[in-house]
Amino acid sequence: MRGPLYQPLGLDLDDGVIRRRRLSAATIGFACAATTIIAGSTAIALFGQPQPRMVDRFDVAASSEPPPTVVAASPAPVVREQLPVVISGSDTAPPPRGGVGFRVEDPQSLRQNPSTAHMPDDALIEDSAYGPLPARAPDGRRPYDVYAGAWSGKPGTRIAIVVGGLGISQTGTMNAIGSLPPGVTFGFSPSGNSLDRWMQEARRSGHELVLQVPMEPVGYPQVDPGEDTLTVGDAAAGDLSALHASLATITNYVGIMNYMGGRFVAEPAAMEPLIAELGRRGLMFFDDASSLRSVAADTAQLQSVPAAVSDLSIDRSQDPADIRSQLDTLERIARAEGTAIGVASAFDVSVATIAKWIGEARGRGIEIVPLSALANDPERR
């Protein structure tokens, strides 16, 4: 018999030990299989059914590299449509490229940007045989809104001062534009010289403009306001050619005011077609109050046209002390009523006195505002 060295390993164990070892091995194998199944089920539940992959069967046998690590793919980024870009009324920059822009309007957002205030808005111009006439834009904007001067919009004591006669004297016009602050409104004469040049200078300086239209006075034609005078008879007959001739001499104004016209503004038959034409074109009417019988304000109210009336004339006298006294009276009216409107001419003494007084009045809390800021505008309500 061969010795123990030549016996197969494990054959010297009794049956009980062999059975226990077989049982233990079977148990371990079963446990491993169960663990594998559970782990696989869990992986499938978490990551989904793995997709079959075609491989070369010889590569599997030949490759000794460990299997690659499976990394969950990052989710694709969500592509959203670009949101609209909100532009405030004071913004002038265009929306970002590719964005959708819309404007959130505020009460002053229709006003021209100061950098382009000297340029007429093509949408507000009607071509005619007389030249460019002011007109409402197709979107409803009015010259009255677009060419309006800027002011703070805050409540307080406010005064509007209209200085007329610009364009007649070149030196006087240059002096007025250079001396008076932006809040002052300028009245241009249609019979003036270099009107487009002075209009641009005034608008660049921040001034609001009105056009002084010659209208029939008492005593006409012996008392003659000048070329293209709008008469009562013509207006009542529906002939507004003289008005159109004046309107075409300049652009970028918010409305018109009467030059003389004591008889005209007192005649409803003449004022009604005039005010209707202004309303159609989106302009205001300013009454200088030279006639106590004027029906301008009432007619404008009935036709929903912006209008304003002067409270007093500042410079009937060319004495600086008298001008100063009138300005002080204007301030008292404004403090009692909240607002006041004064009218003057572009004489050198008037301009110098008004400019000095405005500087002092601002120190007392008075705001000098454009004429349109104090006009009654039924359409805006």
Enumerate the language-model features and the residues they cover.
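C-terminal domain-boundary segment and adjacent tail
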Residues: 278-292, 346-381
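Hydrophobic membrane-insertion alpha-helices, especially the h-region
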Residues: 29-43
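Active-site beta->alpha N-cap acidic-glycine motif
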Residues: 139-223
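Alpha-helical scaffold elements lining the catalytic groove of polysaccharide deacetylases
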Residues: 224-248, 265-270, 298-306, 310-335
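N-terminal, positively charged topogenic segments adjacent to a membrane insertion site
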Residues: 1-25
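Juxtamembrane proline-rich low-complexity "stalk" or linker regions positioned immediately after a signal peptide
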Residues: 45-133
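His/Asp/Glu-enriched short active-site or ligand-binding loop at hydrolase and phosphoryl-transfer sites
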Residues: 277-323, 370-375
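Hydrophobic faces of well-ordered beta-strands that scaffold small-molecule active sites
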Residues: 159-163, 184-188, 209-213, 256-258, ...
